[in-house]
UniProtKB/Swiss-Prot annotation:
This is Sugar fermentation stimulation protein homolog. Belongs to the SfsA family. The gene is sfsA. InterPro entries: SfsA (IPR005224), SfsA_C (IPR040452), SfsA_N (IPR041465). GO terms for molecular function: DNA binding. It comes from Aeropyrum pernix (strain ATCC 700893 / DSM 11879 / JCM 9820 / NBRC 100138 / K1).
Amino acid sequence: MAVELRYDEEAVFLRRVNRFVVEVKSSRGVVRCHLMDTGRIDHLASPGRRGVLIAWLNRLGGKTVCRAQAFKTAGGVVAVVDSRVPNRLFAEAAPMVVGGDASIEAEREVFGSRLDFLISTGRGLWAVEVKGVNLSLDGVGLFPNAPSARAVKHLEVLARLAREGVKPLMAFVALRPDIRVFAPNYRVDRRFASLACTLLRRGLVGMVGIRVSIDLEPGVVRIRPVATAPVQCPPLQPGR
């Protein structure tokens, strides 16, 4: 089943005002739109280029009058920037990840830690944290696209849960269709990448990628999870 994002027009990106606001040139002039992705977007947009898919907000007042739903890159790839989408996609993809019938609970607290998902199957209990990925380099989806202390904390929580008999899993959900495999982003956040690869190599935290298809139609972006994909870490160097 597809996750749908509605949009009203394609605007010209002008600048990023702050973490949550971008300025665009639209049919209504220069306006400010809410941005739900607090990570970097310089790999998605450049000043003066058309390609911001915006939805008008039906409200009076406020600092923003629209929401940036997605960007079209210079290569024409649609990349979603709505931070609500990764969890919605994972909920659709969960059966292909854990296999068979699954009971899925969102925003569940386990052993004092709030998780994106708690999944119960006949093969055990899964604790899942979901990360959206919209940075792609030659088909490799890299996470994070900016240093993320929060993501490091989530890894530490998952590692602790493994000692409680829960199966910990970090799921990386593609937010653009050209991602084929996934990898921790050493160049941007060495702390996260090093911890992620250590936990993965030791079998302490499972990691999976989810590929998507994206269909752009007039007024709507449709995103579908299509397959799981590996999460790759660079080979260990001698002596490490």
